[in-house]
Amino acid sequence: MESVETTTPSNSEIKSVETIVEEQKVNETNTTLNAEVVETPTKTEEKSKTEITNENKERSRGLEAKIKPEFVLPFKKIEKVEVDKAAKKKEFRNQLRESMNDKLCPKISKGLVCEFNETCKFSHDVEKYLASKPKSIGICQNFQTYGECKYGLNCYFGECHIVDNKTIVNKELIGKVEPVKTLNEVSNEIQIQLKTNNYPFPKSEIYFNENGISVRQIKGRNNNNNKNNNKQNDNKRKENEKDDDDDKLNKKIKLENENTTTTTTTTTTTTTETTEKTEKTEKTEKTETTETKKEEFKQSNENTEIDIMTPLKANEKKRINFENQLILAPLTTVGNLPFRRICKRLGADITIGEMALTTKLLEGTKSELALLKRHPCEDKFGVQICGSYVDAAVKCAEFIENEIDADFVDINSGCPIDLVCNMGAGAALMERPKKVEQLLRGISSSLSCPTTIKIRIGKSEDAPTAHKLIPSLGEWGACAVTLHGRSRAQRYSRLANWDYVKQCSEVSSIPLIGNGDIYNYQDVVNIYDSSKVSSIMIARGALIKPWIFTEIKEKREWDISASERLDFIRDFANYGLDHWGSDRIGVDNTRKFLLNWLSFSHRYIPVGLLDKVHYMNERPPAYFGRSDLETLLASTQVKDWIKITEMFLGPVTSDYSFVPKHNSNSYESQG
């Protein structure tokens, strides 16, 4: 972990939470009146291309942000603190995990009868549980709104509905307000089907047979249909993967199609050569018959084999507007549902769920399926999938088509993480255009909604390849492409190459969405005025200041007050409790994800403190804010972030620790 070269006031210098909030409310009016509003420059005031180029060169050096001298603190270097790598690996685990015997049975907590009785793995001792349970954090929002709390005695905000060791309900409120239901909840029955390899994929099977695509054995529990064929599947998979890696499979299909246009090749892992020949003959007869009927007269093919086999063309699919849209990027870990709700309120047009691995989705992994959840406020919502196996991707697309409510599906071909690239997925796909073609054609064939793809400029910034790939994406089935203006190798060590993004927008036949280092509305105005970029995707800029969507739409810089920022943090906490739950696990998850967000948001420098416009790669110097709360929100210390979470989620234990999931301090020297 990088050393932090900034200082913040000690705990003794920071006032209590109550005092901070009270003082901030008193100063709220003055803060708002003094807010700096920057209007859009007129044509005559716009900078020349030479001035913009020189400014971009200066920005690329990664200098410190320019803050008014009266707010800058004296420089004091803090010694580098080494972080135990093993501790970081374990960070994702719940640090306050209880043993099963210490957890109260969910049914007992609601006043119901548990059918397992003494064999139940949870505790049934209510008095013992309540005696060891921490003091209630506050008022339960669910009980106040809906008249009941589904977490019962397990609720950590249960002071208003836990009476005499029982949970009560308010009959007057029940039914008055309809609970907002999260979309894309996959039922237990479907999860079991996925885990046991019993989920049906009829469209995928037909597509595989028609295109000679090998099918891998999906990991799952004991399944009688597949158990006897595991060895045969493994042997054939190894052979087919070699062909697939060398792109020989594509050539084979083309040669066979030239010899006979009506015969289709069937390649499976569970049939013998004899049955393969029989199926080929039957398939040929079916294809010829349907083609003859098609010529003779028109008929409805709904719910027939033809209907299942025939994929929709891009222009026949559901329409979603990718022109002049502000899109929240699919942010792993931090782009969770509560954060997306914040961004929707502040002006994001389109939101995308966190990256989900195709193989994990097909295995029915609960945590992976949770990444597909959608809040009703997300009126334009996409899911992003990542994988390198064509068969898994096509099946995953069919599953999404059947079970998930999404307006489009995005293919991740831009993730630079080694763990993903070593699997041949993410940014590694750009080195294999044939694989990208197979994925796009296969996935789009299973979906009635648009398919999009997110890519980088290439493996190396010195030899970008995106301009060669982009012209073909529309033909392969993509309805839009997002281009992140960085290479796989550089990560965040340099600014995004927007000149190259603009060049690629000239050769794209489909809407091109630009992504990389968007941090103020001026950048967006310049991009739209000087290129054919259709829309803008925002990632880290939204994490640091989610109100960037408001700034872009209103074409102004928002000098947001500290109390307004604290309100967004409070809203995130409430949204988190609503999404993850108000029991112990839910509170811990909400705190963890809130801390991950604060590891980015502390980098924000209020507009009123700046001498000039702040850019993404400019490091904030040590400074103090216009109030104690503003100073606290700018702290780089984890202990202060934890203190902020305690305002809404209650105190942590004395041994609680937190290590950020991502390295948000990406200000490396740009020279």
Swiss-Prot record:
Q: What chemistry does it catalyse, as a reaction equation?
A: 5,6-dihydrouridine(47) in tRNA + NAD(+) = uridine(47) in tRNA + NADH + H(+); 5,6-dihydrouridine(47) in tRNA + NADP(+) = uridine(47) in tRNA + NADPH + H(+); a 5,6-dihydrouridine in mRNA + NAD(+) = a uridine in mRNA + NADH + H(+); a 5,6-dihydrouridine in mRNA + NADP(+) = a uridine in mRNA + NADPH + H(+)
Cofactor(s) needed, names only, are:
FMN
- Biased composition range(s): Basic and acidic residues: 42-60, 248-257, 274-299
Cite the residue ranges of zinc fingers (C3H1-type).
99-127, 134-164
Under Enzyme Commission nomenclature, its number is 1.3.1.89, 1.3.1.-
Q: Name the keywords, alphabetized.
A: Flavoprotein, FMN, Metal-binding, mRNA processing, NAD, NADP, Oxidoreductase, Repeat, tRNA processing, Zinc, Zinc-finger
Q: Where is this region: Disordered?
A: 39-60, 217-300
In Gene Ontology terms, what is a biological process of this protein? mRNA processing
* GO MF terms, alphabetically ordered: flavin adenine dinucleotide binding; mRNA dihydrouridine synthase activity; tRNA dihydrouridine synthase activity; zinc ion binding
Judging by the UniProt lineage, the source's domain of life is Eukaryota
The kind of enzyme this is, by top-level EC class, is: oxidoreductase
Q: Where is the composition biased (Low complexity)?
A: 222-232, 258-273
Give the binding site residues for FMN. P330, L331, T332, Q384, K454, H484, N515, G516, D517, A539, R540
Where do the catalytic residues lie? C415
**What protein family is recorded?**
Belongs to the Dus family. Dus3 subfamily.
Q: What does this protein do?
A: Catalyzes the synthesis of dihydrouridine, a modified base found in the D-loop of most tRNAs. Specifically modifies U47 in cytoplasmic tRNAs. Catalyzes the synthesis of dihydrouridine in some mRNAs, thereby affecting their translation.
* Name of the protein in question: tRNA-dihydrouridine(47) synthase [NAD(P)(+)]-like
The encoding gene is: dus3l
